[in-house]
Amino acid sequence: MEKLNFLLKNTALLPTNLQKERLVQLVLLLNKWNKAYNLTSVRDPMEMLVKHILDSIVVSPYLQGNIFIDVGTGPGLPGLPLAIINPDKKFFLLDSLGKRISFIRNAVRELELTNVEPVLSRVEEFKPDHQFDGVLSRAFASLKDMTEWCQHLLTDQGFFYALKGQYNMEEVSALSAQFSVEKIIEMNVPELVGKRHLVLLKKIRINLMNYL
């Protein structure tokens, strides 16, 4: 907890004591499961706080809307940390590997989270009965693949939130003309070596009246 409090001082985030306890508990669960299921290459719990928890929750101030899907979530990143500090928002966490979804289900139960829905599926095959205000991805795919595979999940007003390391103009150039980059935000993740960026993208709405 001491380490987490120190890291949070270098952000604008103000989680409650219960939320901080749950973030620490999530790290302990991830560390425990990781020994058997190899969910992440990060082995040190202190490193997990920086590389997984802080790297996820710094996105929180930029989320617009109430219902989100985290595609290729792995062991629930960034979805689980974001759900912990945003109890008023709903998060669907999608992955195609059973062991990852098993971990997420266990974490949801242990942390008593009521705003998380684990989904075992490939993103292309997932056909929900509603769309989402935001599609999140962290180390999931290129911008081109993310937008094309996930476009059916997003409302017309929604955003794609792509967490990236070094910003790559080649990825932007490869985007289909039906998507636009709305904003690129350089993220400050305390004690994380290397640059982090949040890329916000939208679907371009075509006004059919222009063609009549």
Curated annotation (Swiss-Prot):
Which Pfam families does the entry link to?
Answer: GidB
The protein's matches in CDD domains, at most eight in alphabetical order, are given as: AdoMet_MTases (cd02440)
| Keyword rRNA processing carried by entry | yes
Name the UniProt key words of this record, in alphabetical order: Cytoplasm, Methyltransferase, rRNA processing, S-adenosyl-L-methionine, Transferase
- The primary location reported for this protein is cytoplasm
- Subcellular localization(s) per the UniProt record: Cytoplasm
What SUPFAM superfamilies does its record include? S-adenosyl-L-methionine-dependent methyltransferases
Q: Does the keyword Disulfide bond apply?
A: no
> According to its record, what are the GO cellular component terms?
cytosol
Write out the catalysed reaction.
guanosine(527) in 16S rRNA + S-adenosyl-L-methionine = N(7)-methylguanosine(527) in 16S rRNA + S-adenosyl-L-homocysteine
Entry's EC annotation: 2.1.1.170
User: Which residues hold S-adenosyl-L-methionine?
Assistant: G72, L77, V123, E124, R138
The GO molecular function terms of this record are: rRNA (guanine-N7-)-methyltransferase activity
Disulfide pairs here are: none
The record's section on PANTHER family has: S-ADENOSYL-L-METHIONINE-DEPENDENT METHYLTRANSFERASES SUPERFAMILY PROTEIN (PTHR31760:SF0)
Q: What does this protein do?
A: Specifically methylates the N7 position of guanine in position 527 of 16S rRNA.
Q: Which family does it belong to?
A: Belongs to the methyltransferase superfamily. RNA methyltransferase RsmG family.
Q: What is this protein called?
A: Ribosomal RNA small subunit methyltransferase G
Q: Which organism is it from?
A: Histophilus somni (strain 129Pt) (Haemophilus somnus)
Q: Which gene encodes it?
A: rsmG
